[in-house]
């Protein structure tokens, strides 16, 4: 089935309007996994001309964003959460090595929190994963990757705190 951005966004809006909590986010994650299998959708929204971060839809009522991410080379992010909101990562091409982290010491403004590694896993094309409010994780991409990602709200508009791995906290 061919998906359009408009239909995809409307489906996600209906799900999140009915259930904005974790269960609703899991339903959106399942819909995203279906959309990731649609090569026409992927080609339309994740072409070579797409930057590393592009909001392709922002819901005026609920505030969630659908983003396209195209990374042409390796990238790594430090451990982070999404502040007061959530995210869903959907892998369209390439692979992302994701690490989940547990809080050792909370962060505060001007003082990074410390975290310890819990597990590593690979997001492969067609896979999606929910990161709820407060979930700490870090992605590593060793080569070109393309993702469709959700944010509960545009994270560039919110203040987030920094974290670092406990072993390197004193380095």
List each language-model region with its residue ranges.
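N-terminal leader/capping segments at the start of a protein or of a new domain
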Residues: 1-40
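A short glycine-rich, His/Asp/Glu-containing loop-to-beta-strand
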Residues: 45-73
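A short beta-loop-beta micro-motif enriched in histidine and acidic residues
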Residues: 58-64, 75-88
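Conserved short histidine dyad/triad with adjacent acidic residue
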Residues: 68-82, 122, 132-134
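Short beta-strand His + acidic residue motifs that chelate non-heme Fe in jelly-roll/DSBH
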Residues: 77-80, 98-99, 131, 136-142, ...
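Glycine- and acidic-residue-biased ligand/ion/polar-headgroup-sensing regions
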Residues: 84-102
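A short hydrophobic beta-strand segment most commonly corresponding to one strand
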Residues: 88, 143-160
